[in-house]
Amino acid sequence: MFFYKYLTHFKDPMKKVLVLLLLIPLLAFAWEPTKPITVLIGNQPGSGNEVGFRAISAIVQKNNPNANFIIELRPGGDSVIALNMLYDAKPDGYTIAVPSYMSTFVTNDIWQKNQKKFRYDSFTNIGGLGKSPLCIVANPTSKINTVPELIDYVQHTTRPVTFAAGGGAHRMTFEYFMFKAHGNKDLVKVSMFPGPLQAVTATASDAGFEFGIMPVAIAKPLIDAGKVKLIGVTGERKVAHYPKVEPIRVNGSYIDVFAAWALLLPPGTPSDIVAWYTRNFIPALDSPEITQYYKDNLIFIDHKETTPTGFANGIEKLRATWMPLSQRVDLLKE
């Protein structure tokens, strides 16, 4: 399809013939999907990884009618089960994954180190697909409404307090918040859920989870419905949709952690397959449909991380920042 559109630019028949002769070697080796593609996601239904990929892949399928993506949810081990499957998959373009940054590239190395088969740099990177600020939300019955109130609460509570979290980045936000706030970790605990939707649903319920941490993109429907209260967001900027809510700042420090999703292929994927995914997925991020979808759902694109090199550089910075804290909180020793 791509080459046909390219040839239509030439009106002279002889030029078309010459260009076609030059393109024959490329046509002979260019890869395109001819059967369904399995998309591994290591979360329960409703994660940002899943909903974001569904939106982007709809654009890709519109431009490539033969591309058929079958999402396979494989939760467990904070996405390790899904990524072990990707690691073992044939590098033929028919198995891909959409994992989260923090789990895959930082915390799996510490908290799931005995479960994983892969190194953080084992996979073939296409690039980042989107990011969303994380947020701290509270059950509507909680007396806490602001970040300063929450800081005081985790310092001085005299009864058990439980946070719900749905991923590695969410757990890291909890740990950093408690570390900077000098919170009482004997009484303030975090309970891990298999996905962010499950974590925010638990926070909204009467199950005893007073607070929750998850992407604001996933919490938004329950925030807007009044089922949970938005306390604060990660990063240094306000979220336009919630102008009255301040970024989380603890003892002068912002929490620079985001929910972030990437497109990865198995180790050793050939360059022609990499080229197809790059050519189709990265431009789709700037399509009018995705631009509007991301705006509506509080997701943004870090364009520096939409190339393999830029993405790899971003991951190294992420590891340099957050590996030390994850090593302080070794779940295998708790």
Positions of the model-derived regions?
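N-terminal secretory signal peptides that target proteins for export/translocation
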Residues: M1-M14
